[in-house]
A protein has these predicted regions:
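Hard-cation-handling environments
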Residues: 229-352, 377, 395, 401-404, ...
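Conserved catalytic alpha/beta cores of large enzymes that bind or transform nucleotide phosphates
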Residues: 219-232, 380-386, 390-394
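Short acidic, S/G/P-rich loop/turn micro-motifs used as interaction or catalytic elements
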Residues: 35, 227-228, 262, 332-337, ...
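Mobile, glycine- and charge-enriched loop segments
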Residues: 346-352, 360-389
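Short, charged/polar "capping" segments at the starts of alpha-helices
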Residues: 37, 93-96, 263, 286-291, ...
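His/Asp/Glu-rich metal-coordinating catalytic cores
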Residues: 2-66, 73-263, 267-274, 278-282, ...
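Histidine-centered active-site/metal-ligand motif
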Residues: 69-74, 173, 192, 386-393, ...
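Internal alpha/beta domain cores that form substrate/cofactor-binding pockets in large enzymes
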Residues: 359, 382-419
Length: 419
């Protein structure tokens, strides 16, 4: 019989680690870093020891890690894994874009530091160490094995780890190319959902897929992020419609959103086109993720995921001052945004905050990273337009009702949340 151990995730959101094994083989689903305010904060040294303790405690002849998606709370401990690691093609590309862009920024900063009239040697050494660590992470990511997402209606190709068979199924989440897993071995069938939702553009067909393939399930391992919240998630399409109303009312629109969430960027793209504004960006990271999404998904949804943004520089200011704009930004762009805000009339300018409101409302989140709250406070006009990247309570009930699993294990949830 296959056995399951939830090392982390039963009483916290994020930082999930699930182990499934037989006599000869085992797989881990996700090895995630703890989120601020969820689980005990740890140092890199503590993370390395914790991973080693888990890995060495139940070693098998055949073993591997499978990542549901590329969010840090699911993939963040990858540097400490010494055997095969698998992730979707899109997930691997996103992670490489992230770390290569970070490396490029650190290298530029290091060169500037070295060219100063009186070089800051301690800062130069710090940046050198950052570059070295980031290169090591990139080298590690390059070794990741991947699977190719299948077309709608096609059965994905299973991956064998000893006598355990893992089949990845594409799902909708707030990051590109997320997957669920069917895990089979010794006559049993387990289904691990990872993070998912039923209200995005890419969730079409998701329940049909579950009805067709998630049959005779012995154990369902499902996320439960929204279990303690009674509100029903609005659709991604509704997000876009609400953005259109705001973009018609204001000439200069900044949208704070994740650069890795293809569907949210698609909502912004659609609203921007409908209101005939130029789509603008300030970040090389956003530029590169949009290029990835356009290359891989640009022919879907009548161009919903085909992006042609303008990269903002001062040379564009006069043109954009006349035409207005939609500017996709992140919390780390505060200085650039503030400089532009000082040149714009505040009564015609607004921030659409399109991220989780806990980043600026919850004390533990603000203590961990105050940039979201500080970013909002730069604007006179702010509106929240957002929907969750996670499945709501009603949709979880629907999934359980469709599968009729013999057992349900709920992870990625608050400690007091119950099905």
């Amino acid at each position: 019989m296959m056995k399951i151990k939830i090392h982390r995730g039963l009483d916290q959101i994020g930082g999930c680690i699930t182990e499934i094994w037989t006599e000869s083989s085992r797989v881990f689903i996700d090895f995630g870093q703890n989120l601020p305010g969820n689980g005990k904060p740890t140092t890199p040294e503590e993370d390395a020891l914790m991973v080693a303790d888990i890995v060495e405690n139940n070693e098998k002849e055949h073993q591997a890690v499978f990542y549901t998606h590329a969010h840090e709370d699911h993939v963040g401990l990858f540097p400490y894994i010494l055997f095969d690691q698998f992730i979707s093609e899109g997930g691997k590309e996103l992670l490489l874009i992230k770390y290569k862009t970070l490396l490029e920024g650190n290298e530029i900063a290091r060169e500037k530091c070295g060219r100063q009239r009186v070089p800051d040697r301690s800062e130069e050494e710090r940046l050198e160490e950052c570059c070295r660590r980031t290169k090591t992470l990139i080298d590690k990511l390059e070794t990741f094995r991947t699977w190719k997402r299948t077309g709608r209606g096609d059965y994905p190709k299973p991956i064998m780890v000893g006598n355990i068979r893992i089949t990845p199924f594409f799902c909708c989440h707030s990051i590109y190319d997320a997957h669920m897993f069917l895990i089979e071995g010794e006559g049993q069938r387990f289904w691990h959902t990872g993070d998912y939702r039923g209200h995005g553009y890419m969730s079409k067909g998701q329940f049909l897929m579950l009805r067709k393939y998630a049959t005779n399930i012995d154990v369902l391992i499902t996320e439960g992020t929204m279990l303690s919240r009674e509100d029903k998630a609005i659709s991604e399409y509704r997000v876009s419609m609400e953005m259109i109303d705001v973009m018609r009312a204001f000439k200069y629109v900044f949208v704070l959103a994740s650069a890795t969430d293809i569907e949210r960027l698609g909502s912004i793209n659609h609203a921007t086109k409908k209101t005939k504004k130029p789509l603008c960006i300030m970040s090389l990271f956003v530029k590169r993720t949009m290029e990835l999404f356009t290359k891989r998904e640009g022919n879907l949804g009548r161009g919903l995921f085909s992006f042609s943004p303008l990269f903002y520089t001062d040379r564009l200011y006069s043109k954009l001052r006349d035409k207005g704009f939609t500017m996709v930004v992140g919390p780390s762009h505060g200085d650039k945004v503030k400089a532009l805000l000082n040149r714009l009339p505040q009564e015609e300018t607004i921030l659409i905050y399109s991220s989780w409101n806990g980043y600026y409302m919850r004390e533990e989140q603000v203590r961990a990273n105050a940039k979201y709250k500080e970013f909002r406070e730069m604007f006179h006009n702010v509106v929240d337009i957002h929907t969750s990247g996670h499945v709501d309570r009603d949709a979880i009930k629907k999934v359980i009702g469709m599968m009729h699993p013999k057992e349900v294990i709920c992870i990625h949830k608050e400690a007091d949340a119950r099905l």
